[in-house]
């Protein structure tokens, strides 16, 4: 095995998906603790606690206690290199989250044991299903009251349409929580409260049919054995092939706050989740062990460092090896550049990187030339597929409080649009600026970031736009005719693309009927 193949085999790149408050931030910290990346996990006790979670670093996230921006953390574990991508936990952030999920090879689903499957989880699982992403499941908060575990598994299967195979099974919950039993290994992992902040080796009791196990379970023993027989009779067994194809999820139980069960999940990612896989480009499939470097940008993030007014483009490496100072071709611009200062991430700690391999995420300094979906290679003209823009569902007109700051407003919105935080439209017939979003919170985020980072205060006004469609047509003459007739509702988006802003659903249906040669598209691939 070559050094490059060995490095690729060590990589595991995954994201955590969950509903807000299911414990994603806490489990992120505990995973980093497993990888010795942070010495003490700063707990996220209350939303106002001073020690903010390491991965939630933007001002508004600190205030709201939700991870709005996708950060990337890399840490070593069991001779593997783990790349963990944090996804926005708020229900609004489907675009950003979707694109993050295009950059991973597997995902960890965190469920609140008291609540089960929640709406946000369903939406994220739909996205994972589009690419058959393998899913590992963690049922969290066993140190509180939870629903019947068998009921939770049934719900996963019925609602998320995926087979659930329990690997561990909880012994009690809340004050009676005594640990978990490993179904195939026939051993008990004992839970002792009070070790949430440090790495500790949990006590293991070999064999359920032992005096030690009887003593540990006490009067819960008989009912637990009965429940296990039921579970083993009714549940699916783990099957590696079904897991890799996204048809079955191994399920683990624990408490992230108590730092219990998190290592079982990380072991599953190392043992079962796929190493970096081949990536489909328009031209061909690119294999991770190919010698030549390729990668695509899935996210752009402004102002990660308040000290530097910068933007970072997050790139997933698909093949080859990044070496400091290497030459790359920026395919869309057909331009060669030398990259000497790529970053690797430990949340908002950044380090300059000497080398990186397929599966790794690196950060490139971006001065406005890199866009989401851009491909970088060592010369080959490739374009990776499947990194879309969605048509926004909500629209607002932007009103500037200080008219003298219109230049800063445009510049700020242009940058936020490039980053994917919002979509911006400039109508052909007016000087208005219209923002589009997939969820209401995005408007708040944009207003607060314009104020914090660009010193521009704005307000929003309602506007009669039902949806946006990207316009294209093979017949140039027809397109010109359409542009003349539909001028009132046409706009140019932040990327310079012609867009139709439909005032109502009926209007859009009529236009599509009237102009059969014009393509009205609800998504646009990043090219």
UniProtKB/Swiss-Prot annotation:
InterPro entries: EF-G-like_DII, EFG_III/V, G_TR_CS, P-loop_NTPase, PrfC, RF3_C, RF3_dom_3_sf, RF3_GTP-bd. It holds the Pfam family GTP_EFTU. CDD domains: RF3, RF3_II, RF3_III. Residues 9-277 form the tr-type G domain. GTP binds at residues 18-25, 86-90, 140-143. SUPFAM superfamilies: EF-G C-terminal domain-like (SSF54980), P-loop containing nucleoside triphosphate hydrolases (SSF52540), Translation proteins (SSF50447). Signal peptide: none annotated. GO terms for molecular function: GTP binding; GTPase activity; guanosine tetraphosphate binding; translation release factor activity, codon nonspecific; translation release factor activity, codon specific. GO terms for biological process: regulation of translational termination. Increases the formation of ribosomal termination complexes and stimulates activities of RF-1 and RF-2. It binds guanine nucleotides and has strong preference for UGA stop codons. It may interact directly with the ribosome. The stimulation of RF-1 and RF-2 is significantly reduced by GTP and GDP, but not by GMP. This is Peptide chain release factor 3. It comes from Pseudomonas putida (strain ATCC 47054 / DSM 6125 / CFBP 8728 / NCIMB 11950 / KT2440).
């Amino acid at each position: 095995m070559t050094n490059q193949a060995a490095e690729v085999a060590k990589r595991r790149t995954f994201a955590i998906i969950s509903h807000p408050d299911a414990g994603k931030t806490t489990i992120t910290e505990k995973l980093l603790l497993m990888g010795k990346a942070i010495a003490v996990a700063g707990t996220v006790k209350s939303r106002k606690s001073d020690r903010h979670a390491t991965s939630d670093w933007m001002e508004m996230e600190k205030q709201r206690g939700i991870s709005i921006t996708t950060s990337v953390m890399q840490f070593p574990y069991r001779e593997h290199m783990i790349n963990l991508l944090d996804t926005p936990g708020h229900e609004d952030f489907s675009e950003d989250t979707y694109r993050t999920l295009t950059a991973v090879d597997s995902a960890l689903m965190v469920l609140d044991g008291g609540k089960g499957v929640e709406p946000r989880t369903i939406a994220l699982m739909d996205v994972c299903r589009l690419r058959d992403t393998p899913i590992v499941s963690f049922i969290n908060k066993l140190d509180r009251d939870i629903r019947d575990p068998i009921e939770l598994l049934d719900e996963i299967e019925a609602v998320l349409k995926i087979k659930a195979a329990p690997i561990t099974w909880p012994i009690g919950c809340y004050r009676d929580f005594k640990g978990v039993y490993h179904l195939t290994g026939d051993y008990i992992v004992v839970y002792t409260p009070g070790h949430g902040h440090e790495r500790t080796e949990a006590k293991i009791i070999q064999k359920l049919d032992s005096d030690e196990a009887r003593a540990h379970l006490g009067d819960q023993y008989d009912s637990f054995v009965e429940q296990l027989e039921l579970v083993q009779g009714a549940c699916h067994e783990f099957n590696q092939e079904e897991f890799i194809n996204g048809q079955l999820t191994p399920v683990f139980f624990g408490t992230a706050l108590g730092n219990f069960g998190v290592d079982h999940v990380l072991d599953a990612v190392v043992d079962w989740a796929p190493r970096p896989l081949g990536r489909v480009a328009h031209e061909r499939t690119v294999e991770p062990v190919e010698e030549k470097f390729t990668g695509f940008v899935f996210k752009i993030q402004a102002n990660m460092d308040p000290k530097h007014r910068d933007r970072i483009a997050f790139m997933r490496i698909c093949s080859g090896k990044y070496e400091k100072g290497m030459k790359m071709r920026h395919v869309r611009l057909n331009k060669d550049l030398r990259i000497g200062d790529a970053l690797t991430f430990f949340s908002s700690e950044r380090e300059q990187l000497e080398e990186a391999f397929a599966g790794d995420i690196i950060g490139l300094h971006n001065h406005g030339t890199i866009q989401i979906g851009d491909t970088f290679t060592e010369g080959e003209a490739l374009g990776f597929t499947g990194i879309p823009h969605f048509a926004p569902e909500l629209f607002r007109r932007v009103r500037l409080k200080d008219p003298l700051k219109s230049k800063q407003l445009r510049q700020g919105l242009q940058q936020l649009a490039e980053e994917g935080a919002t979509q911006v439209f400039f109508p052909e017939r007016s000087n208005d600026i219209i923002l589009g979003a997939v969820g209401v919170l995005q408007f708040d985020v944009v207003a607060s970031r314009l104020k914090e980072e660009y010193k521009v205060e704005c307000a929003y006004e309602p506007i009669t736009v039902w949806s946006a469609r990207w316009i294209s047509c093979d017949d140039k003459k027809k397109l010109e005719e359409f542009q003349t007739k539909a001028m009132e509702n046409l706009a140019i988006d932040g990327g310079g693309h012609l867009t139709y802003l439909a005032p109502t659903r009926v209007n859009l249906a009529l236009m599509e009927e009237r102009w059969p040669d014009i393509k009205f598209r609800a998504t646009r691939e990043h090219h």
